Amino acid sequence: MRRIWNNLTSILLLPALFTCICLISCSQDTTTENQRSAYYWSTTWQMDSSKMNFIQKHHIKRLYVRFFDVVRDADGEIMPNATLQFDTTDENMTVEEKEKESLMPKGMEIIPVVYIVNDCFKANTKTNPISSDKSGRKSSDETPRQLADKILNRILQMNEANDIENVKEIQIDCDWTASTKDAYFEFLHILKEKAKDKKIQLSATIRLHQLSMTPPPVDRGILMMYNTGDVKQLSCQKPILDMKDVAPYIQHLGNYPLPLSAAYPLFSWRVLFREGKFVGIMHADDDFPVLPSDSIVVRKPEMSDIMEAVRSINYQNEDINREVILFDLNTDNIKRFKSEDYEKIFNHRSDGSSI
């Protein structure tokens, strides 16, 4: 397992790509502006001209970049998976980009994100359960401390291998529940202290159902304003974002003890149903065999849904929208709406003007 965690030969990306990212030379004075950010959630880094233009046009200065997942393999071992790979071809670059040797605008802040499957924190798996360091465990069990060490070291190694400098924050994404809270929180506490030694802050995603529970021991949270309904139900028309589902969870945001930012959805799903029953989400046409009698439905948030969510968050706690994050920076997602619509999201106003 150590070889897999430490083997970075397959993830040596283009050092020159991130060298330009880390050059701190902003052309605009953004001291009085709210933070504009986006997630980059993919297994392949492809910063083509359309994404670059979107970033520059909307003055996005921070990217939350998914580095890798952490999952259990078939033997129950906790392992890294789906590590971010860069597209090393030149076909996505314009002549100007090649000449400038720049795939990103200057001044971009990168926040590495690691997604951890909740099963990694369940203690009742057949092998290698992760459990509290204080619990009675076998000597071969994975512990929160060991996992924190491995994840932080892997992030730091990826940063170094790809010339990603000046990283001030890392983020953990996990759909934790009451049954995994203790192990997950202990892991976060340890990781926070280890990151602090490197002068790095720790943030974590916060799902709506987690708002009613004790906040995780991190420096700040990102409230995920999406995946609010049951995509497996054909009758659920708005599984990505429906304020009827959101409203009960956000009533007490003003008293939430952890500093928050909010992430809003741009993505859509193509969902396959067979005889009214959920088959899966189709990310590609060949993900599932499609029968003539099957139904493929498209689920996506409309601009009105997103703006209702933005206004609702403003009403509950306007400080949350001091940083607006789009999920995610995908070529299709950034073409869904007009340019002025994205400005409305960032500016928190339906008329597109700044607050």
Where are these regions (language model features)?
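Short, acidic/polar
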Residues: T44-Q56, P144-A161, Q210, D305-N314
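Conserved, mostly hydrophobic/aromatic
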Residues: L63, I172, G221, A262, ...
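Substrate-binding cleft of secreted/luminal carbohydrate-active enzymes
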Residues: F267-W269, E275-I355
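Chitinase-like catalytic core of GlcNAc-active glycosidases
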Residues: T31-E33, S37-Y40, D69-V71, D75-L223
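Boundary/entry segment of secreted carbohydrate-active catalytic domains
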Residues: C26-I55, I60, R66
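Substrate-binding surface in catalytic domains of secreted glycosidases
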Residues: E186-R274
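Bacterial N-terminal signal peptides
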Residues: I11-C22
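Bacterial N-terminal signal peptides that target proteins for export
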Residues: R2-L13
